[in-house]
């Protein structure tokens, strides 16, 4: 092996065979890949599809389709697509029913005020938040695999949808609208929000058909947390006009956060003292209650419903004091009874809305899947990402027919459900029962609810998202790169908007992956005396090296982005180019350890083939060790065996090194052994 003598160079290859062998060692011949296949056999080759369908193939295909349509086949499909058919027979009624009922009612009680609050964030009337807290929850309970997941309105999605609604159906510049004109404007906005839900649901169903559940891995944890934290700041700023009683047009597009702040500061003198007082008192109650629920979650039988208490107090105060007429406090007003008629959303704006539906569908899937995975790991069960795509796709698609806006799982209500003792998706049905009761019998009560209270509920629900910034010091300690991704994504979300911030975060995150693979260092290996282990020589000065033998390990995928780096590193170590490793002896035998190369693309395979030819031209005997089956198959298709013989492909570095040492011996019998 080429390298400095300080690393324990062995002057004579004969000395290597005289090293102290490991205790209880046995000896065998070095195994090439071909010899290993001959002794132990290989995997069964997958049958290739014929170029033209033959009669036996058509018969097999017909039998397969007939089996899928048979009774057992249909039952298997139902079991796969309707999770309740799997978990209901195993449901522990005595142990779980009470917990599911209490948790479902608790979450449902919170859904009512939060749904109305997030509806205002979506720029639609409050009652549509109640619809979005009912239909999607019901559908997910039937199709979802997350036993502890709570779905419904989500502040980040409401903010993103509200921006689309404001762009597609802007507020008229005149400002003063008649009652009929206001109803028409609200109807158009409801239709736009439902169209966004329809588009995002259709996209998720398309991803389900294509089995693209793996896409959730492209939204890394730093990107998701930075996105939600930055969106929480957008929510806070967007609610300032409602907190202060200001009637300001909603800002959309890039720099909307700063535009809103500037508009609020310029109109600060026009604030309503009554609504400022209501907002201050609401926050004084809501924020401490949230903190108490977190700090004493182990001592409380069920979390304190601060939102419900605040809604009751504010509504009674506004009704008894006539705040809406005496001080012009904005209230929710009348809510329509029952449910809306199923109606296909207007698709005229769908081409414009579809581009906005894509990031919404990605955020929906990524947040829901990550939350479901966290609790699945905690409670030892598994979720199915592709089934989650189906559940959220159907949930958004069908609920859009009932004028619902986009929905997903939420961190606040999911943690609330778990803390309250929820065990299965059955808790969602109890939550739906509470929302249904509010829609059927409690509508008149919400007439006098101040909108400022709903704004305070929006802000207080962002508490956990703001506190995600506390994890930054730990993230910096673990990985500087992930810390940089978090900061860049957060700045992009805050400065631009949520959609562009998400795109920036994904691009930066993917670029860091590419950059990490391009900065990989090739490791030169040496033998640990008395063992069969080959370790990087930079880890110890006592590792043995043999003159003329170079063992290299490249611990990264070999593809188009790393091809140049691989080429330069191998040239430098083997002395094939103009830049030669200083103090290195000429290499006679080289071993490439492929155990760290997980995959090779066409460009990488051609680079390996070119390397073997250059080694032949320079008189270097090249051996490849420990290629996985996929890498070896790709190299074979690139005509690697035209440049090397099967006798140069070994199953391990130890086997290749034993063969190389025999080749370096000037005389002696050509018999070599490997310690095992």
UniProtKB/Swiss-Prot annotation:
- Superkingdom field: Eukaryota
Task: Indicate the segments forming the STAS domain, all copies.
Answer: 539-660
Location comes to: Membrane
Instruction: Specify where the region named Disordered lies, as residue ranges.
Output: 1-24
Membrane topology per the entry is:
Multi-pass membrane protein
Q: Which GO terms describe its molecular function?
A: antiporter activity
Q: Where are the transmembrane segments?
A: 101-121, 124-144, 149-165, 190-210, 226-246, 267-287, 300-320, 353-373, 398-418, 426-446, 487-507
- Keywords in alphabetical order, please: Antiport, Chloride, Membrane, Transmembrane, Transmembrane helix, Transport
A single cellular component GO annotation: membrane
Query: What role does this protein play?
Result: Chloride/bicarbonate exchanger.
Which PANTHER family does this UniProt record tie to the protein? SULFATE TRANSPORTER
Family label: Belongs to the SLC26A/SulP transporter (TC 2.A.53) family.
Q: In its UniProt entry, what is this protein called? A: Solute carrier family 26 member 10
